């Protein structure tokens, strides 16, 4: 039996990679517009990072992480999300000593042991932005505006933005007490995981995916009724900034996100009942990981889910021709000249393909057409003797005569 990719993973083949490159280039340009610079972190980290950052009682840590011991007996985890590693790098690199805010973006694979379903893989990829050092709600609004701009530029319609505030540790303590009082009436109906969460972290019960628990929390107390004045002012300011930016939103008091590090602002972008981007503020994570007390906010966007959305909305990503010129040849002498000419053109960043298969001229032209070459030319004995060759535009068949030796003139055709 032939070997296959592990369940929940997917190869990115050359026929699809242009879509990723298109999105990545667009994301990079938009991130640069906001003053963000790229960060790259390891694909695995010490398990403690996610236990402390994401939270011991979360589904991510309890059920979804790929964790193993290395040969030295250290507990290692393939990263299940991008924020904690970015914060760890920020702290370890002592970037908090630099002028703030620090703005960074990343593309990263993330691994979670989840049920494989439409738009959900065990290895997927995220585009994320993290901004450290700014506590004003205006930066929350700016971060939210980035996915808004991405969807608008891609032509994706029907995306809903839901926002909430989950307060700070001070006001969340009061809310947790009210939540536990409410949940205690239905304690016996909670799933085994949520019974454990009841004392350790009742807020996580709001994020449970079990149907009985989802039904129980429908009438639970609303956290917005319990947040302190500072958190309320921050949330009201955020709404004002979103209004100024003409960003439509809906307040959803039951958004808590599945990661413990969030505080104050949380948000989700939803289309057809599927979350395609999410994030929020995490003002205590930097200190939790060993850095100074410093505010932060960010988001993660699933690239596979975005591509699926584009496909479902029949939004096509333009495929650029990856070959500028197909250089055909007739005979061994011509093949040598084609090799030399291709090298000269490639040195000038003209994308060339030549025949290595000994195909007939007819087969070479058929291949040139199949790979989407913009132009083609065929060198044979006559072309070598005269120094002239017909350059054919594949789109419409129009031909012009060019001098093989006049490289600069030839280059101008492609620029």
Curated annotation (Swiss-Prot):
Which cellular compartments is it found in?
A: Cytoplasm
- CDD domains per UniProt: HisRS-like_core, HisRS_anticodon
Q: Which reaction does it catalyse?
A: tRNA(His) + L-histidine + ATP = L-histidyl-tRNA(His) + AMP + diphosphate + H(+)
Establish whether keyword tRNA-binding is in the entry. Answer: no
Where is it mainly found? cytoplasm
Give the superkingdom in one word: Bacteria
Q: Which InterPro entries match?
A: aa-tRNA-synth_II, aa-tRNA-synth_II/BPL/LPL, Anticodon-bd, Anticodon-bd_dom_sf, His-tRNA-ligase, HisRS-like_core, HisRS/HisZ, HisRS_anticodon
Task: List, alphabetically, the GO terms of the cellular component aspect.
Answer: cytoplasm
Q: Name one GO biological process term.
A: histidyl-tRNA aminoacylation
TM ranges: none
Which enzyme type, at the first EC level?
ligase
UniProt keywords, alphabetically: Aminoacyl-tRNA synthetase, ATP-binding, Cytoplasm, Ligase, Nucleotide-binding, Protein biosynthesis
Task: State a single Pfam family of this protein.
Answer: HGTP_anticodon
Q: Which PANTHER family match?
A: HISTIDINE--TRNA LIGASE, MITOCHONDRIAL-RELATED, HISTIDYL-TRNA SYNTHETASE
Report quaternary structure and partners: Homodimer.
The protein's matches in HAMAP family, at most eight in alphabetical order, are given as: His_tRNA_synth
Protein name (Swiss-Prot/TrEMBL): Histidine--tRNA ligase
